[in-house]
């Protein structure tokens, strides 16, 4: 009996090892197959499991270039920036600078004057979980004004006017995706630390994690991908401005895997903060939200994920803390359907 048990244990060990090695090949096969069907959409994928990193990529930096996209190619991560911002908020919580249930009133710069109806109403966690009820930036109008750089027209003056002129929170406590919420979280971080958001994200995330290809203001680098709108037209990368905390960081698969590695390690500052962001702050019949994170649960798994869409690129990040894996998908075209379908296939068939 002992011998057969030993044999079974070895067999299980071997099958686990081969399964572990099998996952990257299966992910690569799926991504390759998708690229063959969609040769105009370049893609870079990073995957980490039990601290082991795997990468795959297809396509070229642009039509003229023969340089292949790889793990170091730069993309817009767009709204994935929001979970970097919420992680910084959670780091401030760990440092006892703020609490998630603090009202925003005392943490906004002086230019913001909340109407009486709004005072002691909106919590920091409300901003981070998209339920503040505040009006948002009118993106359709901004795109009309400047289809290449819509957020360029958003200034601190516009932001303070939107907030200061708000007299009522029509849907407070209900989910409504918000750019302004994360722009305000950036303002709160700046007030708390007495530094710019750019300086804060560098000091507390980019430098300590050595994410040397994660860029803020200056992203004019040789390994930058080209952004394409859904029709295939070329889009500019968004320039840095006040809305940065909501979606203006640029990065690559390698650095985002570095970030995932820190998130999955509860001993790091980023990992400790990530635990706070994973707590459920909003729940209805359609969704559960942490601080910026979408939370997907079934009987076997809890997944934490966040997608990003600029005018010309799509991305998604997802991780499973219990099973100790994380994945980042970066596309050089705005194509949220493709991004979502790829992640679903990977999660449902390969990482189940």
Question: Positions of the model-derived regions?
Answer:
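Short active-site loop at a secondary-structure junction
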Residues: 37-44, 64-126, 169-180, 244-247, ...
């Amino acid at each position: 009996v002992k011998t057969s048990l030993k044999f079974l244990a070895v067999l299980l060990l071997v099958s686990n090892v081969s399964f572990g090695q099998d996952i990257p090949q299966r992910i690569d096969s799926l991504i390759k197959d998708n690229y063959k069907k969609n040769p105009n959409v370049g893609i870079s994928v990073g995957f980490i499991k039990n601290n082991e990193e795997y990468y795959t990529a297809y396509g070229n930096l642009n039509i003229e270039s023969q340089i292949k996209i790889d793990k170091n190619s730069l993309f817009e991560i767009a709204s994935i920036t929001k979970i970097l911002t919420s992680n910084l908020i959670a780091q401030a919580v760990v440092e006892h600078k703020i609490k998630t249930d603090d009202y925003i009133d005392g943490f906004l710069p002086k230019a913001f004057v909340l109407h009486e109806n709004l005072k002691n109403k909106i919590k920091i966690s409300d901003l981070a979980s998209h339920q503040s009820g505040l009006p948002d930036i009118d993106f359709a109008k901004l795109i009309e004004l400047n289809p290449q750089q819509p957020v360029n027209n958003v200034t601190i003056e516009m932001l303070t006017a939107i907030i200061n002129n708000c007299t009522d929170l029509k849907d407070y406590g209900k989910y409504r995706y918000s750019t302004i919420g994360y722009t305000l979280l950036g303002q709160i971080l700046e007030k708390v630390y007495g530094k710019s958001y750019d300086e804060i994200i560098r000091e507390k995330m980019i430098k300590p994690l050595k994410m040397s290809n994660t860029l803020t203001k200056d992203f004019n680098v040789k390994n930058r991908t080209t952004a394409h709108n859904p029709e295939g037209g070329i889009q500019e990368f968004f320039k840095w401005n006040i809305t940065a905390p909501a979606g203006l960081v640029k990065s690559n698969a390698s650095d985002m895997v570095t970030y995932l590695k820190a998130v999955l390690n509860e001993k790091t500052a980023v990992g400790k903060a990530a635990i706070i962001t994973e707590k459920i702050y909003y729940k209805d019949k359609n969704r559960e939200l942490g601080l910026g994170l979408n939370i997907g649960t079934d009987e076997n798994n809890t997944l934490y994920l966040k997608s990003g869409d600029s005018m010309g690129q799509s991305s998604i990040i997802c991780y499973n803390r219990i099973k100790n894996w994380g994945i980042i998908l970066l596309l050089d075209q705005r194509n949220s359907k493709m991004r979502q379908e790829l992640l679903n296939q990977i999660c449902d068939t390969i990482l189940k």
